[in-house]
Swiss-Prot record:
The active site is at 227 (acyl-thioester intermediate). Gene3D superfamilies: Bira Bifunctional Protein, Domain 2. Catalyzes the transfer of endogenously produced octanoic acid from octanoyl-acyl-carrier-protein onto the lipoyl domains of lipoate-dependent enzymes. Lipoyl-ACP can also act as a substrate although octanoyl-ACP is likely to be the physiological substrate. Its main location: cytoplasm. This is Octanoyltransferase. The keyword Acyltransferase applies. One of its GO terms (biological process) is protein modification process. Pathway: Protein modification; protein lipoylation via endogenous pathway; protein N(6)-(lipoyl)lysine from octanoyl-[acyl-carrier-protein]: step 1/2. In the reaction, the free carboxyl group of octanoic acid is attached via an amide linkage to the epsilon-amino group of a specific lysine residue of lipoyl domains of lipoate-dependent enzymes. GO terms for molecular function: lipoyl(octanoyl) transferase activity. It comes from Brucella suis biovar 1 (strain 1330).
Amino acid sequence: MPTGKLRQKPPYAAIMTNSPVTPSTETQQPKRDALYARFLPQEADAPPVEWLIAEGLTDYEEALAFMEARVQAIREGTASELVWLVEHPPLYTAGTSANAEDLLTPDRFPVFNTGRGGEYTYHGPGQRVAYVMLDLKRRREDVRAFVASLEQWIIETLAAFNIMGERREDRVGVWVVRPEKPRLADGSMCEDKIAAIGIRLRRWVSFHGIAINVEPDLSHYGGIVPCGISEHGVTSLVDLGLPVTMGDVDVALGKAFESVFGPRQTK
């Protein structure tokens, strides 16, 4: 993993929004840990979120086209909210804040420019991607609280396997402290990223989502500077010594989702 310093990122670096968000100063914004990280529907009779698990590997361009169509249908009221769980073949994606210098080996895997927020990340077999298509108007029109809720969903999922995932105010995503690894040059504890978040909002309907490393080939991250952060590494559940399957993670994701976002409906 390349070494270096954490670059300063603009606010909402993992978010791209076409929704009318009013900017506020840093002093006005509570820390994400202080936000109420539950995004339940406001209506008591709101329909459950559709929960769909794709089989095999999903082509990335097909996934983008599917999300675009579904978001439009949710906005028009002709489709329900949806969480779609997929795995992709090996690829890199570039968010709206990506720096070309962070793509270290451009010819290693296909590279897709995407409208989500954030920088470069990797998707591939052994990583569970959850595309989250929710209507925030039915919940809360609060982007930072939504990101905190996505982090909470991941944290509660990891807790099912006795893994303590943590937020970091300067880094969106979920992190695991690695006391068994050498400390950083400044003496701080080593931390590895286990889950990434990159979302986009269109008229308050979300798409893109989260990615949790279950058992991907972590060497594939060597072709990028993940999320523009070079001083911390990446890890996975299996890398942490847990013999879990994708099915195990899907069960934990489902239970934690209901805690944070409310009822879901499986097919």
